[in-house]
Design a protein with these regions (language model features):
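Localized chelating/binding microdomains
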Residues: 30, 167, 186
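Generic protein-terminus/edge-of-domain signal
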Residues: 1-56, 63, 70-71
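All-alpha amphipathic helical-bundle segments outside canonical DNA-binding/catalytic cores
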Residues: 123-137, 154-157
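N-terminal positioning helix adjacent to the helix-turn-helix/winged-helix DNA-binding module
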Residues: 109, 155-163, 199
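Basic/polar phosphate-binding segments, predominantly the helix-turn-helix DNA-binding elements
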Residues: 146, 174-205
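Short helix-capping/hinge SLiMs at alpha-helix to coil transitions
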Residues: 169-173
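A hydrophobic/aromatic-rich effector-binding and dimerization subdomain
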Residues: 1-16, 57, 61-126, 139-148
Length: 205
């Protein structure tokens, strides 16, 4: 596992592609994934959620997640990433809340949502105004179908999750291994070993 933190700006990225294993990572963008063929597993914390064609998954900003492909055959999905700027009035709630169950099953998704996602895929990315308007429709139709809880309740209480969450929360600050270990209530030697062996990060002490 390698920690990846992407600092997105004023951008919406949408692509339909073959699904593959994606290691645990996080970013400050909203991520929406819609399975278009086959199946996909969305991992949030220690939970793994099975998705099939038509299911839509929502990963709010700064939530650790990963993807796995366990189903044989052709598995494809539309992946949409939207920076905090582009999610407008939904930005504040997404900073503090997250879906308790991040999947909306296909039978609960309105046909309009699929049409709008396809429209985002077909929009020229040079003009963000149109895809941003489409995104608001997707969120307006879908957010109400998700049970939102405090973001701290989503994921895992294990040390790996706490460490990645700490790094993401303090991503733009300078902090030492000793400071992080103290804040997490563990030995710096235990923490250093975890970061090196599990996250594959060379932490400068």
């Amino acid at each position: 596992m390698q920690l990846k933190y992407v600092d997105t700006k004023e951008v919406i990225i949408a692509v339909n592609k073959k699904s593959k294993h994606i290691e645990p990572h996080l970013h400050n963008a909203l991520e929406i994934v819609c399975v278009t063929n086959g199946a996909l597993e969305l991992g949030v914390g220690q939970e793994l959620y099975h998705m099939e064609k038509g299911d839509i998954g929502f990963v709010f900003p700064d939530v650790i997640h990963h993807y796995q492909v366990l189903t044989p055959g052709v598995n494809k999905a539309t992946y949409l990433m939207a920076s905090p700027f582009t999610i407008a009035k939904f930005a504040d709630i997404m900073q503090s809340m997250a879906p308790e169950y991040p999947i909306i099953k296909a039978e609960k998704v309105e046909p309009e949502v699929y049409r709008v996602i396809n429209a985002i895929l077909e929009t020229e990315q040079s003009d963000i105004t149109v895809p941003q308007a489409y995104l608001q429709i997707v969120l307006a139709r879908c957010i109400g179908k998700l049970n939102l809880v405090e973001k701290s309740n989503v994921g895992s209480n294990d040390l790996i999750y706490q460490t990645v969450s700490y790094i993401s929360a303090n991503f733009k600050k300078k902090f030492s291994l000793e400071e992080m270990a103290k804040d997490l209530g563990v030995s710096k030697y235990v923490l250093n070993s975890l970061i090196s062996k599990t996250l594959h990060i060379n932490f400068k002490q």
